[in-house]
Regions:
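A short loop-to-beta-strand scaffold at the N-terminal edge of the catalytic core in hydrolase folds
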Residues: 1-10
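Conserved HGGG/HGGXW glycine-rich cap/lid loop of the alpha/beta-hydrolase fold
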Residues: 9-59
């Protein structure tokens, strides 16, 4: 399945950290965490497909689809190295 163009937010500077929210949440659930880390890290939070401001794409979704979406966003932002923080998947 093709990846979707996920809605995302970038704050701060430094090593890249992608924040992946849980099912039923959205990128803004990471706002408080990013606020505390943005002085030392580039914080990238994004809405999973079908959540928040991201399009739904084609149902059903698989874990591979969600990984493909993250990889597409990583490439779009030209990020070579990254850390990933997530919960509830």
């Amino acid at each position: 399945m093709a990846s979707v163009d996920c809605s995302y937010s970038i704050k701060g500077s430094g090593p890249a950290v992608f924040f992946v929210h849980g099912i039923g949440a959205r990128k803004t659930s990471w706002n408080e965490v990013c606020h505390h880390l943005e002085k030392d890290f580039t914080c990238i939070s994004y809405d999973l497909r079908g959540h928040g401001d991201s399009p739904k794409g084609v149902l059903p979704y698989s874990l591979k689809d969600l990984v493909d979406d993250l990889e597409t966003l990583r490439q779009k932002l030209n990020i070579q190295k990254m850390h990933i923080v997530g919960h509830s998947l």
